[in-house]
A protein has these predicted regions:
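Core AdoMet radical
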Residues: 129-139, 150-194, 207-226, 236-255, ...
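Short metal-coordination and nucleic-acid-contact micro-motifs, chiefly zinc-binding Cys/His arrays
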Residues: 21, 82-85, 133-136, 140
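Short, intrinsically disordered, charge-biased short linear motifs at domain edges
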Residues: 9-14, 65-79, 128-135
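Membrane-interface junctions of multi-pass transporters
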Residues: 46-93
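Detector for the c-type heme attachment site
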Residues: 90-94, 147-153
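N-terminal pre-triad scaffold of radical SAM enzymes
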Residues: 30-43, 122-150, 210-214
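Recognition helices and adjacent regulatory flanks at domain boundaries
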Residues: 96-130, 140-142, 163
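Radical SAM enzyme [4Fe-4S]-AdoMet core and its adjacent flexible, acidic
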Residues: 1-58, 62-65, 100-108, 156, ...
Length: 445
């Protein structure tokens, strides 16, 4: 195991990571997210994606991951410098000298031998992945408020039907202004060279070197390529020790029964997303049916798969209901075990006007207090993982940070502009759904 003698995350960091450099992260070598629809990659979900060179992958499928940009960032980490794209972790670490950022969690999953090899090899060396998250396309029946057309075909339909969201001055990336056609470079039925390169690399190396292959989307269970991979695992049992993981929104339309039946005998983890309960969850994650989601969670928890994981994207709207959501998930744990589900709490940064920092400090402190009460209630419970306690602890500290600067009024204006248009397009009502935020919302002009 990567950790020794029940050491804490901080003890592990000091023993394994800090002796290499002040910025080393195993994810830069051994982990990747790759969007095959757009031909982009990143080392984890925090840095922005960048383009994969089409010529390079025609000669070397491993260039899907081993891009020029990643090799430059590896060299920076070997020298103890901080790559700019990894600022999510640097901000967490700068909050206190012993703060644990995600680079610890992205590193601890790899063997010390692999980590030593990564640090010692020249930065231009190609590495085979150990963990990979892959998206074949953006087909999805949800259009979550913090998502955008680059990752959801339902979001594309909104923009094409209703036009761009307007008057969003802080959205410099234009998340909600166009259909992001570059996110789906090839039409359905056309040959996609990025998909071809992936399956080549899978056959030559990845099925041997990957410890986990995680399929995301869009909604991956709506992609034929996902079922193609599941069929490969069924037909080649014993040939690969790779664990299969699938991100799914567990919507009404998702055929959970087919998934569980098709993966019998395959080591499977299921990841899903949510961060609050009932109508507030349905507002944020447009397309969600809360009752259907809970029913699917129950079905999976009873199925005997390896693990069930819930990813919480911490945004401004989820904070009122987050304590109740955590309590609901603890009830699941008590009924099944601590891994059904495990939880992660990732603070949303983009779009910035949906981040928790858009709220006034007094509101954020109120929600920090409520989350802290839940944390105190459960932190010594054997059902809680150390990473869950640590991530909630850092969330409480984050919410209590004062925020000043010229961008805050613009972010708050965009918050009101966006949700006003979101309500009109989606048939929703912000004030009725979030009475806790009514006063704040209505005073924005």
């Amino acid at each position: 195991m990567p950790k020794q003698n029940n050491e804490t995350d901080l003890e592990y960091k000091r023993r394994v990571i800090d002796i290499k450099s002040a910025s080393f992260c195993g994810a830069k070598w051994y982990n990747a997210t790759i969007w095959l629809g757009s031909g982009q990659t990143t080392s984890c979900h925090h840095p922005l994606p960048h383009a994969i060179d089409l010529h390079e992958i025609s000669q070397n499928p491993a260039a899907l991951h081993n891009t020029t940009q990643k090799k430059k960032e590896r060299e920076q980490m070997q020298r103890g410098e901080r790559p700019a794209g990894c600022d999510y972790c640097w901000k967490i670490e700068d909050m206190s000298k012993d703060a644990i950022s995600d680079r610890v969690y992205k590193t601890v999953i790899h063997s010390e031998e692999d980590l030593n090899v990564a640090f010692a090899r020249p930065s231009y060396t190609d590495f085979n992945l150990r963990t990979l998250e892959i998206a074949f396309d953006r087909t999805c029946q949800f259009a979550c408020s913090y998502c955008n057309p680059a990752f959801s075909s339902t979001w594309v339909n909104d923009i094409r039907k209703n036009g761009p969201y307007i008057n969003l001055v802080s959205d410099g990336r234009g998340h909600f202004t166009h259909a992001h056609d570059r996110s789906q470079l090839y039409k359905f039925g056309e040959t996609n060279p990025y998909v071809e390169a992936f399956f080549k690399w899978w056959e030559t190396d990845l099925h041997r070197t990957l410890t986990e292959l995680r399929i995301t989307g869009g909604e991956p269970l709506m992609s034929a390529h996902t079922w193609q991979l599941i069929d490969w695992f069924k037909a080649n049992q014993g040939r690969s020790s790779t664990r299969l993981a699938i991100n799914t929104n567990l919507g009404r339309e998702v055929d959970v029964d087919r998934l569980l039946a098709s993966t019998q005998g395959i080591e499977l983890d299921i990841y899903t997303s949510n961060e609050t309960i009932t109508g507030q969850a349905e507002y944020i994650r447009d397309g969600l049916d809360w009752s259907a989601w809970v029913d699917n969670m129950e079905k999976i928890a009873k199925s005997g798969i390896r693990g069930l994981h819930v990813m919480c994207t911490i945004n401004a709207l989820c904070l009122p209901g987050l304590p109740a959501f955590i309590t609901t998930m603890m009830m699941f744990k008590r009924s099944y075990n601590r891994n059904f589900p495990s939880m992660s709490f990732n603070i949303l940064r983009f779009p910035s006007f949906q981040s928790p920092y858009v709220l006034p400090l007094a509101l954020r402190q109120t929600y920090a207090d409520a989350i802290e009460q839940v944390l105190v209630q459960y932190q010594d419970d054997s059902l809680m993982h150390e990473h869950e306690v640590n991530q909630l602890t850092r969330l409480v500290a984050y919410l209590r940070e004062p925020v000043v600067g010229p961008d805050l009024p613009r972010m708050q204006n965009d918050f009101k502009q966006f949700y006003t248009q979101y309500d009109q397009r989606r048939g929703k009502n912000f004030v009725e759904t979030f009475p806790e935020l009514k006063e704040f919302y209505e005073q924005i002009h």
